[in-house]
Amino acid sequence: MTQVSTPVRTRFAPSPTGFIHLGNIRSALYPWAFARATGGTFVLRIEDTDVERSSQAAVDVIVEGMKWLGLDHDEGPFFQMQRMARYKEVLAQLVARGQVYPCYMSMTELDALRERQMANKEKPRYDGTWRPEPGKVLPAVPEGVQPVLRFRTPQGGSVIWDDKVKGRIEISNDELDDLVIARPDGTPTYNFCVVVDDIDMAITHVIRGDDHVNNTPRQIHIFRALGQEPPVYAHLPTVLNEQGEKMSKRHGAKPVTQYREEGFLADAVVNYLARLGWSHGDDEIFSRAQLIEWFNLDHLGKSAGQYDEAKLRWVNSQHMKLCDNGVLAGLVAEQFARRELLVPVDERLARMCALFKDRCSTTVELADWLSMYFVPIQASEQDLAAHVTDAVRPALQTLRDKLAALASWDKASISLCIKETIATHALKMPLLAVPVRVLVTGRAQTPSVDAVLELFQQEIVLKRLQSV
């Protein structure tokens, strides 16, 4: 079990530059679950410094996706663009301490340096031309050039941290060049802003994708330059798509909210995503409450998780079986609304859900089944020819007459009518039940025919049986 000595504070810090997919949202789920499991605080931070690509629409999609999945944040959303004055204040502190310095090297010079290094089979990196050192003569400052500010990365030694997923990581400082932390216009860069945010928001645990591992040693140096110890890091392996590629919009990933439209339950998606990189023994199906009870960082997986839609559909089907029928009724009504069909969310719809949900893996499939109750049906010619034969028509007429005479439309009365008809015509149950299903529901296979008929309005059943 993960031991924590101070109140846990985690964060999800997406960039609003496009829709959010399952691979992204897992980086929200785990810090949310860890905060909830430890009684901590979950912070939402929007890293919107890429002004050209960021949009309010993308922010709205992030918030909507998190809201649907129930990943509620305790603080935020905080926007980096609204914190620029704070970043510049902290940057001035580093300047005053001599921990950053101006660099006037042009992009042309940097490109030429990089080409020389690559030609010599060296790692491309800034060579410290403008880094002040005792006794070093710096180049003449070019006229009319605004410098970037670079951070003085410690020389010699290494950066070490105990990653909660990857274990002990050590990176030599000689591998790191002097990071640009402010652009020529004075705007702070990503790695600097992140550290200031994490300090100001008192983040104790950073749980994020392993594409950030290379940023971590740089951020640790900035933390320590500001007199702070870094948080605990947990770098999550990549989520792969079904083709084994990194999940991304380019490779066909869907927006999180599309899963809602396709009939997946939020709790099922949370369950599936949690298992895509974390485990609690052999438990495959669990509730949100169980996830919170069980979640810790010690059982995060070290290998990439691969998305499998068939498995997600199976998980969803299990959650549908467990789902409250009244809740399902509301979700099915939303599916009907997308088809421009207004269906009341009432006890009758809940009973329909109870009867048919075990046959379905999504609420879209459940709405497909239940549409027989609300719109005209059309049985296939094949089913009509196979089951509604001349031999059974007299029995169908007898059953219709008995059903028409019922004063009480309930399962027991309908069942009695069916049994009496079978006895009168010396039939076996399937020889009557299947043609009734075909005529009334449009399908040859359904749950128990008396239970199915009970949920119809009596006059609709009589009208559909009249077609014989």
Curated annotation (Swiss-Prot):
GO molecular function: ATP binding; glutamate-tRNA ligase activity; tRNA binding; zinc ion binding
EC number per UniProt: 6.1.1.17
Reactions catalysed according to its record: tRNA(Glu) + L-glutamate + ATP = L-glutamyl-tRNA(Glu) + AMP + diphosphate
Keyword Oxidoreductase: no
Chain span(s) of sequence motif 'KMSKS' region: 246-250
Residues that coordinate or bind ATP: K249
Gene Ontology cellular-component terms listed: cytosol
Keyword terms, alphabetized: Aminoacyl-tRNA synthetase, ATP-binding, Cytoplasm, Ligase, Nucleotide-binding, Protein biosynthesis
Superkingdom of this protein's organism: Bacteria
Classification via PANTHER family: GLUTAMATE--TRNA LIGASE, GLUTAMATE--TRNA LIGASE, MITOCHONDRIAL-RELATED
Family: Belongs to the class-I aminoacyl-tRNA synthetase family. Glutamate--tRNA ligase type 1 subfamily.
Subunit structure: Monomer.
Protein known as: Glutamate--tRNA ligase
